[in-house]
């Protein structure tokens, strides 16, 4: 049967006519396989789906008994469902019965609660029964319950405040803080204090450049008496080469910049260089996207053509474009109605027709690809109806003039139109997750009505800022990094310990694989060699995803085979712990002649000063008194001071504080 019954006409053919109608018996309805399997009287893989004499059973039995008639074309159809109530403020450990009303094409309304599928978007906050009873647990926050019936979806939203205590919140001075603080007030969740300067310095430097602050930068920042020195530091980082390198790496991987043959090296290197230049020059994001999606010509003339080498067919081009730049995972609609969204196959193939005229041909070398658009009207054929479909954006009008120009240009025009919220919300959410560790929508590229943002007002504010700045990514970054919310401490203050998505405090996040390797090299004063790359090349500066490194692999660097950032793993694993504890690679780094342990063992500074330098290099802070005395005691009792410093550096590398941005 079709997924969730989205293709009733096909289901009717299978049930009633296929295999000589053996699944149904009008003469003996109760012996019909459809019913005996549903109640598990006839064993099958699906198990029991209903009970005998239940409402569902009686409806199906009556239909069989009455002759299994198909529906008529003019039968009333469900055009919308509504949840009652739509939202409610609830206490912890409380319940709410929700009802679902179906609105039909002939104007009638019907309570369909008993036939609806319900699903909670956060089972740690709330569960929901098959009959629509929502059970709130003990966590404060906001939770949504999805209701789905005959291709329609609706949401019930519950806000669960903390009941005890009277909290104080600062006055917001920008739209980001205003949206977050308003939500925290409504939920009575206290907000943490702003972090200290050293924490901010390490956090923002890692987030913007992917590397630790240097000793010189720590001194430069610390000696700045200006009240606005945090904003000044953000500007300093945004103008650095490491900023462009770090974000070029981010985009290079999800744009699938990889090489499958040695001959593709020049193209992948050129594409990376192009991405890096666009970021360094702060190219408006809409123009950046246009150059990729509408790329034509040869790689040496227009490097974004490389993207078409990996997305080699119409479907992958459509799906990557939707996921990367619109936050829409539309893949499901290729074969059937999307189970969690309103997109039908027609929506999918109307989008696909934008790419229907894209062709490729070999260039001067076997590994070179030339992309061009052939003449003719862009069309896609609906796989079930055979209808010839003109290009149209999701929820957008049919593009009538797409046969008079490159249809992809028309697609980008629709995408970047400021009235089209998909584009601005998608990139805003993606960048929010980069800095805050969690998207307002999770996963960050799966934005749909059944996966609502944790703070809709904040997502709107970010998208508004982006469109008003004409898609200026540096302006978006400035807004986020200068906000009080970004600069909050990770330390909870009682009741916000369990908050995971309201941004009442900063959430620590494990560094990415490239950040960890680059931080190890920077901290230990060593470097990692990569095949065919110049000495001292950072992992974040590798031009494509095809460089082999066990370290990067074990810490979750993606191979660039999909457009999904979920290909990257930032989870901590046993293999990572073992690698840090026993890796010959790390041990060799600590033993290099010019590595940090050797520098410190030969230093004329006191051991206390050396220990302070170690902590500054790793954590951008001086050691606490306990940390200092513990390290001094160890170094004093060790005869071989070089080994003592090797042990100290090794111990720091194995600290969670080193591996996390906090």
Residue ranges with predicted function:
Residues 1-12, 62, 66-74, 329-344, ...:
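Periplasmic/extracellular electron-transfer cofactor-ligation site
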Residues 1-57, 74-101, 106-173, 203, ...:
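Solvent-exposed helix-loop boundary motif
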Residues 20-21, 45-51, 262, 506-507, ...:
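Active-site rim elements
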Residues 36, 50-70, 575-586, 590-592:
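Catalytic cores of secreted or luminal carbohydrate-active enzymes
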Residues 70, 151-155, 227-228, 299:
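Short helix C-cap/helix-to-loop transition motifs enriched in small/turn-promoting residues
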Residues 95, 113, 327, 346, ...:
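Extracytoplasmic
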Residues 168-242, 248-531, 566-567, 587-645, ...:
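Primarily short, surface-exposed interaction patches in extracytoplasmic proteins
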Residues 524-541, 545, 551-581:
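Long, His/Glu/Asp-enriched segments that create or flank divalent metal/ion-associated functional microenvironments
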């Amino acid at each position: 049967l079709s997924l969730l019954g989205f293709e009733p006409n096909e289901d009717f053919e299978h049930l009633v006519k296929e295999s000589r109608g053996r699944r149904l018996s009008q003469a003996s309805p109760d012996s019909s396989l459809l019913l005996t399997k549903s109640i598990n009287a006839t064993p099958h893989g699906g198990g029991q789906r209903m009970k005998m004499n239940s409402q569902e059973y009686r409806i199906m039995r009556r239909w069989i008994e009455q002759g299994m008639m198909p529906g008529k074309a003019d039968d009333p159809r469900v055009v919308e469902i509504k949840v009652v109530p739509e939202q409610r403020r609830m206490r912890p450990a409380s319940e709410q019965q929700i009802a679902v009303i179906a609105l039909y094409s002939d104007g009638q309304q019907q309570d369909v609660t008993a036939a609806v599928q319900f699903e909670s978007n956060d089972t740690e906050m709330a569960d929901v029964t098959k009959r629509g009873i929502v059970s709130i647990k003990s966590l404060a926050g906001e939770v949504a319950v999805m209701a789905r019936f005959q291709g329609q979806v609706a949401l019930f939203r519950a806000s669960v405040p903390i009941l005890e205590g009277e909290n104080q919140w600062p006055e917001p001075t920008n739209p980001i803080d205003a949206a977050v603080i308003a939500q925290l007030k409504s939920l009575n969740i206290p907000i943490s204090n702003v972090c200290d300067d050293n924490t901010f310095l390490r956090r923002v430097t890692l987030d913007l450049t992917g590397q630790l602050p240097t000793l010189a930068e720590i001194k430069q920042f610390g000696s700045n008496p200006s009240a606005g020195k945090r904003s000044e530091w953000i500007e300093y980082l945004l103008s650095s080469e490491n900023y462009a390198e770090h974000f070029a790496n981010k985009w290079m991987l999800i744009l699938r910049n990889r090489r499958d043959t040695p001959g593709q090296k020049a193209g992948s290197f050129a594409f990376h260089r192009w991405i890096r230049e666009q970021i360094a020059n702060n190219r408006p994001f809409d123009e950046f996207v246009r150059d990729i999606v509408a790329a034509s010509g040869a790689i040496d003339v227009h490097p974004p053509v490389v993207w078409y080498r990996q997305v080699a067919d119409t479907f992958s081009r459509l799906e990557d474009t939707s996921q990367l730049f619109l936050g829409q995972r539309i893949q499901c609609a290729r074969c059937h109605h999307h189970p969690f969204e309103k997109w039908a196959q027609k929506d999918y193939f109307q989008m696909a027709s934008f790419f229907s005229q894209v062709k490729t041909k070999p260039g001067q070398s076997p590994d070179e690809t030339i992309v061009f658009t052939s003449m003719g009207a862009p069309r896609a054929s609906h796989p079930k109806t055979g209808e010839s479909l003109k290009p149209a954006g999701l929820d957008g009008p049919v593009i009538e003039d797409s046969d008079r120009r490159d249809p992809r240009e028309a697609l980008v025009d629709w995408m970047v139109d400021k009235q089209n919220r998909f584009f601005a919300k998608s990139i805003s959410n993606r960048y929010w997750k980069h800095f805050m560790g969690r998207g307002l929508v999770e996963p960050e590229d799966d934005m749909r009505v059944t996966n609502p943002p944790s703070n809709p007002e904040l997502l709107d504010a970010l998208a508004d800022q982006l469109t008003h700045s004409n898609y200026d990514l540096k302006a978006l970054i400035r807004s986020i990094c200068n906000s009080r919310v970004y600069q909050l401490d990770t330390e909870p203050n009682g009741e916000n310990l369990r908050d995971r998505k309201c941004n009442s405090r900063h959430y620590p996040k494990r560094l990415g694989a490239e950040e960890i390797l680059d931080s190890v090299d920077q901290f230990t004063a060593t470097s990692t060699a990569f095949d065919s790359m110049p000495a001292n090349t950072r992992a974040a500066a590798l031009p494509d995803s095809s460089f082999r490194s066990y370290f990067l692999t074990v810490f979750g660097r993606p191979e660039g085979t999909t457009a999904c950032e979920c290909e990257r793993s930032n989870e901590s694993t046993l293999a990572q712990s073992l690698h840090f504890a026993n890796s010959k690679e790390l041990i060799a780094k600590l033993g290099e002649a010019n590595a940090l342990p050797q520098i410190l063992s030969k230093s004329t500074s006191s051991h206390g000063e050396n220990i302070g330098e170690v902590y500054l290099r790793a954590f951008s802070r001086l050691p606490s008194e306990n940390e200092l005395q513990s390290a001094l005691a160890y170094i004093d009792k060790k005869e071989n001071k070089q080994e003592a410093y090797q042990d100290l550096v090794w111990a720091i590398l194995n600290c969670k504080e080193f591996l996390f941005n906090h």
